A protein has these predicted regions:
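Residue-level detector of family-conserved "landmark" positions at structurally sensitive sites
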Residues: 109, 139, 168, 226-227, ...
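Cys/His-rich metal-chelating microdomains
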Residues: 34, 38, 48-51, 95, ...
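N-terminal juxtadomain amphipathic helix
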Residues: 2-83
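Conserved Radical SAM active-site core
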Residues: 50-187, 355-363
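Conserved AdoMet/S-adenosylmethionine-binding subsite of the radical SAM
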Residues: 119-277, 282-285
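Short, cysteine/histidine-rich loop/knuckle motifs that typically chelate Zn2+
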Residues: 30, 44-47, 91-94, 98, ...
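Auxiliary Fe-S-binding modules of radical SAM enzymes
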Residues: 1-39, 238-371
Length: 371
C-alpha cells in the first residue's frame, strides 16, 4: 500500500509561484516562509517539493468538500444566507497546537493525520457547487496558500459558471502569491491568531507577514474579514487585544472582526475553553477601539447582540442572527441601511430570498462522496 506522501507526490504538477535559483534550488513564494528548497527536498508545508529544479505542487484532488452556510466560514458581510461550497487539500505552513482541522492541515507532519485524497477536476467541483445551489466557492480546511495553484484552477472554473470565490486562510502570504491569487478571489478571511510575534513563532510563523497581508488585501479591494480565536492565556490579554484592534482600525474601521471561542482540541487539551463573558469582553474592546462591525462567534445565544449586524451610523438592526442562522434581514437591495441609507460595507445581493441551510451530506468527515 502506498504511503500518504507517495499518494500526494502522484498528484502534483509544476507550480507557478516560485523562482528557479542556482544549482537547481528553487524559491517558493506560496507563503511567508519563502522557502529556499534544494533538489529532492520539501518546503515547510511538506507538500511543495523540488524535483530536479522544478517546484512540484499539489494538484487534482481534494481531502474535504462540503456545502454549508457562508456564515460558518465565517463571512457576515458577504451574501448573507448564501451557501458556500467549501473544498480543501492537505498540508499547512503552520503547526498550531489547537488546530481544529489538524487531520487535514497536519498531513505529512503528524502520522495520525491521514485524510485520504480523492481525485477530482476543477470543472467537476464548480459544477457540483452549482448543483447544490452554492453562491460562492471557498478554499479552506487546510491552508489554501500552499495549494494556491489548485485553488486558482477551481476558481477559474467557478467564475466561468457565475460563482463568487473566497479564501479562508492564516494570511501568511507574500506579495507574489497575492499577485497570483487576488484576480481570482472576491472575499478573504484571515485568521489573525495573535498580536505577539513570540506567540506566532510558537505556531511556526511570524506576525509581520500576516499584518502585511491584511494591509495588502484591503488595498487591493478584496473584501476582508478577520477572525481571532480567543485562547485563554495565549492571546487574550488587554494589552494584546488593544494593539490588535487598533491595528485593524488603522487599516479600516469597516473591516469586520470576529472573535471566536476556543475549545480543547488536538494537542492543546489542558487549556480551559473560552467563556461567553470572555468573548463579550474582547468584542467590547474591539468596539471601543473604533471597529464598526464586531462579532462574537460560535457560542450562539449567549453573547448578546454581538451576533447581529447593525448600522454603524444609526445602530439600526440590519441582520439578526442566531449562530449561523439568519432570523431577520433588513439591508436594502443596494446594500444600505433602510433607516438612514448609510452604505453597509461588504458584498450584498440585490435581494434576500431566505437562507438555504439543509443539504444532504454523506459520511467521511466533512467530505461527501465524489461520485
Amino acid at each position: 500500500m502506498s504511503s500518504l506522501g507517495e499518494l500526494l507526490n502522484q498528484r502534483t504538477r509544476e507550480g507557478d509561484v516560485y523562482d528557479r535559483l542556482e544549482r537547481e534550488w528553487v524559491r517558493c513564494h506560496a507563503c511567508g516562509h519563502d522557502c529556499a528548497i534544494p533538489p529532492g527536498a520539501v518546503g515547510v508545508c511538506k507538500v511543495r517539493y523540488n524535483d530536479h529544479g522544478r517546484l512540484q505542487v499539489p494538484w487534482g484532488y481534494v481531502a474535504g468538500v462540503q456545502c454549508d452556510p457562508i456564515e460558518k466560514k465565517p463571512f457576515f458581510h458577504a451574501w448573507p444566507g448564501a451557501l458556500a461550497y467549501s473544498f480543501g487539500m492537505l498540508g499547512c505552513d503552520l503547526h498550531c497546537a489547537y488546530c481544529q482541522n489538524w487531520v487535514t492541515s497536519q498531513a505529512l507532519r503528524d502520522p495520525a493525520a491521514t485524510a485520504p485524497p480523492r481525485d477530482v477536476d476543477p470543472q467537476w467541483l464548480a459544477a457540483d457547487a452549482v448543483r447544490l445551489g452554492a453562491r460562492v466557492v471557498v478554499s479552506t480546511y487546510n491552508e489554501p496558500l500552499i495549494t494556491v495553484e489548485w485553488a486558482v484552477a477551481v476558481f477559474r472554473a467557478a467564475r466561468a459558471l457565475g460563482l463568487a470565490t473566497g479564501f479562508v486562510s492564516n494570511g501568511n502570504a507574500t506579495p507574489q502569491v497575492l499577485d497570483y491569487l487576488t484576480p481570482w478571489i472576491d472575499v478573504y478571511k484571515v485568521d489573525l491568531k495573535s498580536f505577539n510575534d513570540r506567540q506566532y513563532r510558537k505556531l511556526g510563523g511570524r506576525l509581520q507577514p500576516i499584518l502585511d497581508t491584511i494591509r495588502s488585501l484591503h488595498a487591493r479591494g478584496v473584501w476582508l474579514e478577520i477572525v481571532t480565536l480567543l485562547v485563554p492565556g495565549f492571546n487574550d490579554s488587554d494589552e494584546e487585544l488593544k494593539a490588535l484592534t487598533e491595528f485593524l482600525v488603522s487599516v479600516s474601521p469597516e473591516i469586520p472582526w470576529h472573535v471566536t471561542a476556543f475549545h480543547r482540541d488536538y494537542r492543546m487539551t489542558d487549556t480551559a475553553a473560552t467563556t461567553a463573558s470572555q468573548l463579550r469582553r474582547a468584542a467590547a474592546m474591539g468596539q471601543q477601539a473604533g471597529l464598526q462591525h464586531v462579532y462574537a462567534g460560535n457560542l450562539p445565544g449567549v453573547v448578546g447582540d454581538f451576533e447581529d449586524t447593525r448600522c454603524a451610523s444609526c445602530a439600526e438592526l440590519l441582520v439578526e442572527r442566531f449562530g449561523y442562522h439568519i432570523q431577520g434581514y433588513h439591508v436594502t437591495a443596494d446594500g444600505a441601511c433602510p433607516a438612514c441609507r448609510t452604505p453597509v460595507p461588504g458584498r450584498w445581493d440585490t435581494g434576500f430570498a431566505g437562507q438555504a441551510i439543509d443539504r444532504p451530506f454523506l459520511p467521511y468527515d466533512r467530505t461527501r462522496r465524489l461520485s
